[in-house]
Swiss-Prot record:
Matching InterPro entries: ExoRNase_PH_dom1, ExoRNase_PH_dom2, ExoRNase_PH_dom2_sf, PNPase/RNase_PH_dom_sf, Ribosomal_Su5_D2-typ_SF, RNase_PH, RNase_PH_bac-type, RNase_PH_CS
Function of the molecule: Phosphorolytic 3'-5' exoribonuclease that plays an important role in tRNA 3'-end maturation. Removes nucleotide residues following the 3'-CCA terminus of tRNAs; can also add nucleotides to the ends of RNA molecules by using nucleoside diphosphates as substrates, but this may not be physiologically important. Probably plays a role in initiation of 16S rRNA degradation (leading to ribosome degradation) during starvation.
Entry protein name: Ribonuclease PH
PANTHER family: EXOSOME COMPLEX COMPONENT, EXOSOME COMPLEX COMPONENT RRP41
Family designation: Belongs to the RNase PH family.
Organism expressing this protein natively: Dechloromonas aromatica (strain RCB)
EC supergroup of this enzyme: transferase
Length: 238
């Protein structure tokens, strides 16, 4: 039995709240159980130097955790003067995931930065960040269309992410912190709404996992992503 009493294929309760803050072009609070992440999208009418004059835009991301997002306080990375390797890895993952579903040429020479700030962490923060940031990105692009700066929204498909793993010998969906810290296998799967795989990050924390187990986990993640895409659609329709 899982610590949360959930079924093996059961997501935590997902809530996506749009327009959570006032100033950003896209603003979303995503809650997956007790994990809460604020995702904002900021539009700049310029691109990084390596893209100037090339007729395309850019989407990038930054990720961070509030000092008391976890059980004990962690110092702000700004106070230390550098980001951890984990932070850099996660924000690159978020950026890659979002760029996989947007037409950068259709975006034009502008940059959209997604800031994902973890308010409370209970496992799956990078996955929640991707799922929430997609809604913020779509919202920001929609505002560009409404302002007459784009003829159509350049976001071509949904993208969402979910964790899966092997916990006490059984495959489970959407690991919370107690499961994440005690699982045999931990895997993050990023997929599009059409079912395309963007990225899989899988690690054996204990016993190595088999190819058959990996297939089961990817199937489980596919089920989870379908539910998350439905949650994204509901948020946009609200």
């Amino acid at each position: 039995m899982r610590p949360s009493q959930r079924q093996p294929d059961q997501l935590r309760t997902v809530r996506i709240t749009r327009n959570f803050t006032r100033h950003a072009e896209g603003s979303v609070l995503i809650e997956m159980g007790d994990t809460r992440v604020l995702c904002t999208a900021s539009v700049e009418e310029n691109v990084p130097p390596f893209l100037r004059g090339k007729g395309q835009g850019w989407v990038t991301a930054e990720y961070g955790m509030l000092p008391r997002a976890t059980h004990t306080r962690s110092s702000r990375e700004a106070a230390k003067g550098k980001q951890t390797g984990r932070t850099q890895e996660i924000q690159r993952l978020i950026g890659r995931a979002l760029r996989s579903v947007i037409d950068l040429k259709a975006l034009g020479e502008r940059q959209i930065t997604l800031d994902c700030d973890v308010l409370q962490a209970d496992g799956g923060t990078r996955c929640a960040s991707i799922t929430g940031a997609w809604v913020a990105l779509y919202e920001a692009c929609d505002k560009l269309v409404q302002a007459g700066k784009l003829p159509a929204n350049p976001v071509r498909d949904h993208v969402a992410a979910i964790s899966v793993g092997i916990y006490k010998g059984a495959p489970v969906l959407d690991l919370d912190y107690p499961e994440d810290s005690d699982c045999d296998t931990d895997m993050n799967v990023v997929m599009t709404g059409a079912g395309g795989i963007v990225e899989i990050q899988g690690t054996a924390e204990g016993e190595p996992f088999t190819r058959e187990q990996m297939s089961v986990l990817v199937d489980l993640a596919t089920l989870g992503v379908r539910h998350l895409v439905a949650a994204q659609q509901s948020a946009l329709a609200a």
